[in-house]
Amino acid sequence: NDETHTFSAGPGGATAAWGLEPDAITIGKAIGGGIPCGAYGLSAELAERVAARDDLDLVDMGGVGGTLAGNPVSVAAMRATLEHVLTEDAFARMTALADRFVAGVRATIDRHGLPWSIVQLGARAEVRFTSPAPTSGGASAAAHDPELDDYLHVALANRDVLLTPFHAMALMSPATTEADVDRHDAAFADAVGALVAAG
């Protein structure tokens, strides 16, 4: 299971939230709070099979390594993130903020009768310029609207709010406050209102 984009579901990512039991799991830089790092885990059965083939480490076909493998800064970042961010308490707060974010965005979308949607996965929320929200990669690609995406990013940046690049998405963090979410909601409402007024 690749948790690169689903780790925001909770302390154990979508794997724990949905009760999955994968043979392998990968986690990207979210496990280090954005510092370049990653981790993977294996089921006992798969780990035994991998360990039985230590001869593969002698060739370029297997093994784990690289300039970031065991890097002390990456390891320290992962430890801090595991201890202070990827916890039940932190996720309860971050998910509540994402709920608030979604409610504010949805209110603006509904007020203007726009064919948009907002999707949430734990502490992550993303505006989609289609309704209902896409449920597959193909549908997501077909619904992509680069002009609306660019407009929203620039309009919000001009109102002192930054969204995640390449998506109209926000990720709540332990540092995010209700005031931050409310500031976004006001800026989003103003930007969307200006877009609707311009026709």
Where do the model's predicted regions map?
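Conserved N-terminal phosphate-binding loop of PLP-dependent enzymes in the Aspartate aminotransferase
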Residues: N1-G199
